[in-house]
Regions:
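C-terminal substrate-binding subdomain of Rossmann-fold SDR/epimerase-dehydratase oxidoreductases
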Residues: 200, 204-335
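Conserved internal alpha-helix in NAD(P)-dependent oxidoreductase domains
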Residues: 75, 86, 90-97, 110, ...
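Active-site helix of classical SDR
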Residues: 147, 151-154
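Conserved Rossmann-fold NAD(P)-dependent oxidoreductase catalytic core, especially the SDR/UDP-sugar
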Residues: 97-147
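Rossmann-fold cofactor-recognition segment
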Residues: 45-56
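NAD(P)-dependent short-chain dehydrogenase/reductase
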Residues: 126-128, 157-230, 265
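NAD(P)H-binding glycine-rich loop region in Rossmannoid oxidoreductase-like domains
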Residues: 54-91
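N-terminal Rossmann NAD(P)H-binding glycine-rich loop of SDR-like oxidoreductase domains
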Residues: 6-26
């Protein structure tokens, strides 16, 4: 490996891809591969831009031809995937095939890492030990999330198939719901923080307030991808065993329910404002059947020991600290 290794980040204009790109540019040359340029200025970093519609194989192949490692973060998410199903299929399925095939054919690219998600496990009925081999349960999510989860499972399966038939690394890092500045506006965490800082009530829905969520801090995401990339470049990824050996669960192991999330945000805002702002929590009953019970989070245990060992890190940032740091940043912006 040299300091001039080139990392190509497909979908690098998005939140997670952009965060990874900026972090990796400290040690590598980075190329963002996306249909739109990032909203942040790539000239501030060691980053170039290659415009590409990943539905077009020739374009993908051209953009990836000179990279050493590829990271695939492109995805059509909720709610757009439900509004434009064909686009979701073409980007999430065909696009992923194109990225994997371009890596497969390239004499230069050493491997690929996919940003996966914990949602492939499903959300309801989690029980027992949840580790990398827990399995896929796309029918254990809300209807609005089904096509997204289908897509993330399909992306994993495509990547893992290439891993099984190639001598290159095709890895997956399944992420918890990512916490960090710049995260999508419509996430529960962002909504709670913004409403809370305005002194408005935090309004979890009654039917989902006990939903156990798995989170990860964006700082843990970027450092983990940095480590994984370096392992590929240094030939330190063990290639024996099935493709599951190259799959990692990157989540803080203690689940947090939506109600607990609201309570953490409320308490954090109250403490950091010295009691000047203490948002109320008001449960909203939409008349829907409850999907979870108060003890749902205690019915399963998350095992991330494989991830900790593979990455060589001691522990992950807990969600409570992530939220505290986010609230501090938002308060500074309001001064």
């Amino acid at each position: 490996m040299t300091d001039l290794s080139l990392v190509g980040i497909v979908g690098g204009g998005g939140y997670i891809g952009g965060a990874i790109a900026r972090e990796l540019s400290k040690k590598h040359v980075v190329k963002v591969i996306d249909i739109r340029e990032p909203t942040w200025n790539i000239k501030d970093y060691n980053i170039s831009f290659c415009r590409c519609d990943i539905r077009m194989f020739d374009c993908v192949q051209e953009c990836l031809q000179d990279v050493d490692v590829a990271i695939h973060t492109a995805i059509i998410q909720i709610p757009r995937i439900n509004e434009e199903k064909r686009l979701g299929f073409e980007i999430n399925y065909v696009g992923t095939m194109n990225v994997c095939e371009a890596v497969y054919r390239s004499p230069k690219v050493r491997g690929l890492i996919l940003t996966g998600t914990w949602h492939v496990f499903g959300e309801s009925g989690l029980a027992g030990v949840v580790d990398e081999s827990f399995g896929y349960r796309p029918d254990k999510v809300e209807d609005r999330a089904r096509l997204y989860v289908f897509s993330k499972i399909a992306q994993e399966v495509i990547v893992r198939y290439y891993d099984e038939m190639s001598d290159k690394v095709y890895g997956v890092v399944r992420l918890g719901t990512v916490l960090g500045e710049g995260m999508p506006e419509k996430t529960a965490t962002n909504i709670f923080i913004e409403r809370g800082l305005r002194g408005e009530s935090l309004t979890p829905f009654k039917h989902s307030m006990y939903r156990p969520m798995l989170y990860v801090d964006v700082r843990d995401v970027v450092r983990s991808f940095d480590i994984y990339v370096n392992k590929i470049l240094n030939n330190e990824v063990e290639m024996r065993g099935s493709s599951l050996s190259r799959v990692l669960n990157l989540v803080y192991p203690e689940p947090v329910t939506i109600l607990e999330l609201a309570e953490i945000v409320r308490d954090t805002i109250a403490r950091l404002t010295n009691g000047k702002i203490v948002p109320k929590i008001e449960i909203v009953d939409q008349g829907l059947q409850p999907l979870f019970t108060e003890d749902s989070k205690y019915k399963f245990k998350v095992d991330i020991s494989k991830t900790i060992k593979f990455l060589g890190i001691e522990k992950l940032i807990e969600p409570r600290r992530s939220i505290e740091d986010l609230v501090k940043i938002r308060l500074q912006h309001r001064m």
